[in-house]
């Protein structure tokens, strides 16, 4: 028992530190069929393989979408469970210079969000600029996931209709200047 208590005490500073890290909730949306989308700007991180997910040393932020089933989800879906097979991109636009980049968000796994869609990226302009981020979230193509008869009868021919979600006047400076470790 003493070993467990000692190990737990060693982890407390890690949890306290993680709780103090800034994270920016850009917006939240609930959409059919019972999917919650949380759009976030987070501190860049070491994600492997880094060539595929963005080098921490060459990035300003970690742009992400947490996609989970909510209480309105079809039967069989686990509330809070990850919604797989989404195709998500983010267009990050500097409102002053009109410079923009398109970033594809792919599945990631960490200890705080579990599975989520994200990418480390450089901002298209100064860290202290004002930005618009437009997220495009689409369900999988018909050939990418099988849809059983019961889903087709109760929900429809596809997982998710998708949508475009635009957020303006975003200030990423605190996130861009922060470090995880």
How does the language model describe each region?
Residues 61-80:
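Short amphipathic, basic-aromatic surface patches that mediate peripheral association
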Residues 80-100:
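Extended low-complexity, serine/threonine- and proline-enriched intrinsically disordered segments
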Residues 111-120:
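Aromatic sugar-binding surface patches on proteins
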Residues 14-19:
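Sec/Tat signal peptide C-region and signal peptidase I cleavage site
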Residues 137-151:
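Short acidic/polar inter-strand loop motif in beta-rich domains
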Residues 163-181:
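Compositionally biased low-complexity segments at domain edges in trafficked proteins
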Residues 102-111:
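Solvent-exposed serine/threonine-rich low-complexity stretches and specific carbohydrate-binding patches
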Residues 126-136:
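A short tyrosine-centered beta-strand micro-motif
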